Amino acid sequence: MAIQKVFARQIYDSRGNPTVEVDLTTETGIHRAIVPSGASTGIWEALEMRDGDKTKWGGKGVLKAVGNVNNIIAPAVVKANLDVTDQKAADEFLLKLDGTENKSKLGANAILGVSMAICRAGAAQKKLPLWKYIAENFGTKGPYVLPVPSFNVLNGGSHAGGDLAFQEFMILPTGAPSFSEAMRWGAETYHTLKSIAKKRYGSSAGNVGDEGGIAPDLQTPQEALDLIVEAINKAGYEGKIKIGLDVASSEFYVDGKYDLDIKAAKPKPENKLTYQQLTDLYVELSKKYPIVSIEDPFDQDDWSAWTHMKAETDFQIVGDDLTVTNVKRLRTAIDKKCANALLLKVNQIGSVTESLNAVRMSYEAGWGVMVSHRSGETADTFISHLTVGIGAGQLKSGAPCRSERLAKYNELLRIEEELGSEGVYAGAHAGKYIKAAKF
């Protein structure tokens, strides 16, 4: 089916920053996609094109990317008479049109918006739900897996104020019998956590960060973990909810060491750790708290640190800034035995096909996959369908708070309802591809 029209516009994300929205028209209607944006971004990510005009939106406008869609991509894809049901060919056309390795000519945010809209148009042409269309393209067979939600309930790092260097503290309801029950458990634990934090640290401790998690003024990861474990137990889910961390350690990697006091007014020299010391800290924390998954435990280019931790521990070790959903980086990480799970962010690489290629490579290597939102999000629910379509079994989309986060979780509730007996909840098998992980 031919593409009749492509039109992009600048809209706003959950942080009030500009982002790209694309409308793609075929005879089945208008198919819309909105591109997210990250705060802690890996240096190896595909180029997110911003205008750089400091007099408007602090330089974060995306009118150049919008212009590239409307003036370059749109006429080219209409003229090429692309088949929207051939995602691979459509994405290859877009990549060739850009012609650079990191999408610096047109912008990954321009290309991705069109790629996602084409995927939605393909699903409509095939008269399939988006998750089913992705599943058929990827080769996923039923029963279809509903993911364990990784709720980012407590924020630190670049997502919040306070001295806490670690960026995300997540709860994973692995013991729940269904996705809908996992949502209930997560919401109840989140509200319990917020109540405890406000009583202990004052009402401002209930204020939320970019991803909906609370952001109390804490000094150490132990303080954060103590709060979370107390909330889990008080909510009645002791032993049934696990903990995941996104350390985002590239953000506090300075001169070959990891500075846990990088945000502190009075930093202590003893809190500048080697990668061996930081590994020991993770192991020590896991003995006291039910931690099963650690994302970006080290800097994106500190390869030896990753290899060391993978050899010495049995965590799910998730590569985000390390791999940036890029098959070249991913292949290196696999060969070096750096991790055992990929964090999948479609805007890191900039097209649907390249994202699926990274998933396929991960599965073939025995890795798990956790699909992820970005801190600057929108109401777009593409990643909910992607998660089910590829059978990932894990999704992180922030806390059960803020509508741009709940949009993804609520869409999964609808998919669960639609699937009925064809759907299974990943639960304790979320890390099913990872033999060593402690799920």
UniProtKB/Swiss-Prot annotation:
The modification Phosphoserine is found at residues 249-250, 351, 355, 421. Its cofactor is Mg(2+). Its main location: cytoplasm. The gene is eno101. The modification Phosphotyrosine is found at residue 253. GO terms for cellular component: cytosol; nucleus; phosphopyruvate hydratase complex. The lineage of its organism: Eukaryota, Fungi, Dikarya, Ascomycota, Taphrinomycotina. This is Enolase 1-1. Mg(2+) is required for catalysis and for stabilizing the dimer. Pfam families: Enolase_C (PF00113), Enolase_N (PF03952). It is found in: Cytoplasm. Mg(2+) binds at residues 246, 295, 320. It catalyses: (2R)-2-phosphoglycerate = phosphoenolpyruvate + H2O. Its EC number is 4.2.1.11. Substrate binds at residues 159, 168, 295, 320, 372-375, 396. GO terms for molecular function: magnesium ion binding; phosphopyruvate hydratase activity. Homodimer. It comes from the Eukaryota. The active site is at residues 211, 345. Keywords: Cytoplasm, Glycolysis, Lyase, Magnesium, Metal-binding, Phosphoprotein. PROSITE patterns: ENOLASE (PS00164). The keyword Phosphoprotein applies. The modification Phosphothreonine is found at residues 85, 353.
